[in-house]
Amino acid sequence: MVQLLAGRWRPTGARRGTRGGLPELSSAAKHEDSLFRDLFEDYERWVRPVEHLSDKIKIKFGLAISQLVDVDEKNQLMTTNVWLKQEWIDVKLRWNPDDYGGIKIIRVPSDSLWIPDIVLFDNADGRFEGASTKTVVRYNGTVTWTQPANYKSSCTIDVTFFPFDLQNCSMKFGSWTYDGSQVDIILEDQDVDRTDFFDNGEWEIMSAMGSKGNRTDSCCWYPYITYSFVIKRLPLFYTLFLIIPCIGLSFLTVVVFYLPSNEGEKISLCTSVLVSLTVFLLVIEEIIPSSSKVIPLIGEYLVFTMIFVTLSIMVTVFAINIHHRSSSTHNAMAPWVRKIFLHKLPKLLCMRSHADRYFTQREEAESGAGPKSRNTLEAALDCIRYITRHVVKENDVREVVEDWKFIAQVLDRMFLWTFLLVSIIGTLGLFVPVIYKWANIIVPVHIGNTIK
């Protein structure tokens, strides 16, 4: 009974016949195992696989990008996930498929055979090579290796038109030790493959093209492939949360001159705007690289607005000083000041004319033939004249104060239109070049890529 149960529960492979307790290999596995032993028994992965020493290996090189991970403006780095496509002929990996059960393709780990030492020259994190994956080897010796890699490459960031900027970042690939007489690189496809590209939320790739070049020294020449990525920043985020608030603060400065001069909040409003602009400038400093070669567009606009606000504080202080002038604190108003600010400028600024309310004293010219006696009526007239002179003097003082206040209003209105005009011209002068560049460079490239 025990023998019957033992025979019933015997493993299937054991019934068919085993080799050391393991199932025997199938015919295909035997052929592939034999093929690997024959190919790699005397294979040396450090030796360049050529028939003659003077022969050179031609590497077909292509690039596919799967993701533009990040563009670090501060450290001037571009992080990408790419696939390196390489294909070459290994004369030591050839076989006749008929001798090995019709096997035409095998997969071999890249660390088991000779591979070209093609690296990214402008790498910024010290990782010059990609991941180690399997290669596809065909019976005629063709080796295809698609190598995934995550690169941080150096990229010179031009922030002149930030955040409406267009960057050109390049990736330069070449052999680390072999010259062109030993390993030559052939550009397989000029365009970077973007079939499996995952869109980035901040950057858009306008074009990605490759080109071949050669570097020559005293003895040898070294081929390399350079891929240029033209990328455009998507400016919606920075426009909504950076540019529009800055423009709003700039025009808010103009509103200061619409407040009455006797309001103390004018200086407070100007100071608050200046502090807000300083905060925006600190935010910009954290984003853009520290460089003295170029000043970003938004930085120029912030500096322009800060100077604008500083001048507005100065002229506001001057207007408040004019508003509180009187005959007891300052000398009499100069005739040219009266003519310009009380008669000329109000008409040009569409303000209500300031009537001349100065009292014109009538000349009292009474001539007498001889001294008259002072009677009661004359004494009363003297009292009336005294009161009249006192009233006229107070009226003159009050009218002088009103004239200075009106001049302060004229200055506020003049500065209102002047600063509004300067703000509009400055804003258009800084952003029109960006609009021109956008219309003449970025839009045609985008349309061309869409048609393609």
UniProtKB/Swiss-Prot annotation:
Entry keyword set: Cell membrane, Disulfide bond, Glycoprotein, Ion channel, Ion transport, Ligand-gated ion channel, Membrane, Receptor, Signal, Synapse, Transmembrane, Transmembrane helix, Transport
Glycosylation sites: 140, 168, 214
Stretches of the chain found on the membrane's Cytoplasmic side: 323-414
Extracellular side: 28-239, 436-452
Domain of life assignment: Eukaryota
Cystine connections: 155-169, 219-220
Any one biological process term the GO annotation gives: synaptic transmission, cholinergic
Subcellular location: Synaptic cell membrane; Cell membrane
Glycoprotein recorded as keyword: yes
Catalytic activity, as annotated: Ca(2+)(in) = Ca(2+)(out); K(+)(in) = K(+)(out); Na(+)(in) = Na(+)(out)
Description of how activity is regulated: Activated by a myriad of ligands such as acetylcholine, cytisine, nicotine, choline and epibatidine.
CDD domains, per the entry: LGIC_TM_nAChR
Gene3D superfamilies in UniProt: Neurotransmitter-gated ion-channel ligand-binding domain, Neurotransmitter-gated ion-channel transmembrane domain
Lipid bilayer topology: Multi-pass membrane protein
PROSITE patterns cross-referenced by the UniProt entry: NEUROTR_ION_CHANNEL
Entry annotated with the keyword Transmembrane helix: yes
Gene Ontology CC terms, in alphabetical order: acetylcholine-gated channel complex; cholinergic synapse; dendrite; dopaminergic synapse; neuron projection; neuronal cell body; plasma membrane; postsynaptic membrane
Record text on subunit structure and interactions: Neuronal AChR that forms heteropentamers composed of two different type of subunits: alpha and non-alpha (beta). CHRNA5/alpha-5 subunit is only able to form functional nAChRs when co-assembled with another alpha subunit, can be combined to CHRNA4/alpha-4 or CHRNA3/alpha-3 and CHRNB4/beta-4 or CHRNB2/beta-2 to give rise to functional receptors. Interacts with LYPD6.
Family, similarity comment: Belongs to the ligand-gated ion channel (TC 1.A.9) family. Acetylcholine receptor (TC 1.A.9.1) subfamily. Alpha-5/CHRNA5 sub-subfamily.
Record's protein name: Neuronal acetylcholine receptor subunit alpha-5
Source organism of this protein record: Rattus norvegicus
